[in-house]
Amino acid sequence: MNVLSCSINTLIKEGLYEISGVEVGQHFYWQIGGFQVHAQVLITSWVVIAILLGSAVIAIRNPQTIPTDGQNFFEFVLEFIRDVSQTQIGEEYGPWVPFIGTLFLFIFVSNWSGALLPWKIIQLPQGELAAPTNDINTTVALALLTSVAYFYAGLSKKGLGYFSKYIQPTPILLPINILEDFTKPLSLSFRLFGNILADELVVVVLVSLVPLVVPIPVMFLGLFTSGIQALIFATLAAAYIGESMEGHH
C-alpha cells in the first residue's frame, strides 16, 4: 500500500509540475529595422493563408458541369456563406460575401489548426507555435477590421447622415450609442480569443494528468466549439454591417 501510495503521489506531483510549466504569453519576435514583429502569429497565419489559397486553387481548377465531390463541397461552403450574409445583411449582401467568407474561413481554419496541426514539434528560440486565433493580437485585428467594414458600409450608403443614428431615438442616448460601437470589437475579439485559448489549455492540462485516450472527447468538443466560434464571429460581423446599412439597433 505504501508503494502504491508513493507512486500515486509521484504521478500527481509530476502531473502538477507539468501543468505549472504550461506558459501563456511567451512570444517569439523578429527584429525588422526598429520594430519588433510578433513572429509566431505571422508564421501560423501564413500557413493558414497557404491552406486557404491552395484550397481555392483546387476549387477553381477545371470546374465540371456535373460537379465532383470536391467541387460539391466548395459550392456548399460558398452557398452557406451566401446564406449567412443574405440573412444578416439583406438584399445588398452581394458585395460583402467575399469579406464575410474570408473572415469565416480564416477563423475556422485557424481554430482547427490549433487542434489538428502539430505546431508543438516546431521548436522556437522562445515560446511555441499555436493557432493564430490563440493570440489576442489576431482577434483584435479581425475585430477592428470588422469595425472598419461596418463604418464603411454605413458611410458609403448614407454619407455623413450615418452619424445621425447616434442621436436616435433621442439625443440622451448619444453616450450609450457611442459606447456600443466601442464594445462591439471588444466583445468580438475577447470572445474568440478566450474560447480558443481556454480550449487549448484544457486539452494541455488533461493530457498532463491522464492518458491520451481520455482527452480525445474533449478534443472533438473543441473542434465543434471552434467551428461555432467562427460562425458566431462571421454572423455578428454580417449583422453589424447590415445594421449600419439599415440604420437601426
UniProtKB/Swiss-Prot annotation:
InterPro entries tied to this protein = ATP_syn_F0_a_bact/chloroplast (IPR045082), ATP_synth_F0_asu (IPR000568), ATP_synth_F0_asu_AS (IPR023011), F0_ATP_A_sf (IPR035908)
Superkingdom field: Eukaryota
Q: Which UniProt keywords apply?
A: ATP synthesis, CF(0), Chloroplast, Hydrogen ion transport, Ion transport, Membrane, Plastid, Thylakoid, Transmembrane, Transmembrane helix, Transport
Q: Name one GO cellular component term.
A: plasma membrane
Location(s), subcellular: Plastid, Chloroplast thylakoid membrane
Record-level Gene Ontology MF annotations: proton-transporting ATP synthase activity, rotational mechanism
| Pfam families according to UniProt | ATP-synt_A
Enumerate the transmembrane spans: 40-60, 97-117, 136-156, 201-221, 222-242
Membrane topology according to the record: Multi-pass membrane protein
Q: Which family does it belong to?
A: Belongs to the ATPase A chain family.
Q: What does this protein do?
A: Key component of the proton channel; it plays a direct role in the translocation of protons across the membrane.
Which NCBIfam families does the record match to this protein?
Answer: ATP_synt_6_or_A
Assembly information from the UniProt record: F-type ATPases have 2 components, CF(1) - the catalytic core - and CF(0) - the membrane proton channel. CF(1) has five subunits: alpha(3), beta(3), gamma(1), delta(1), epsilon(1). CF(0) has four main subunits: a, b, b' and c.
**Name recorded for this polypeptide:** ATP synthase subunit a, chloroplastic
> Which organism was this protein described from?
Barbarea verna (Land cress)
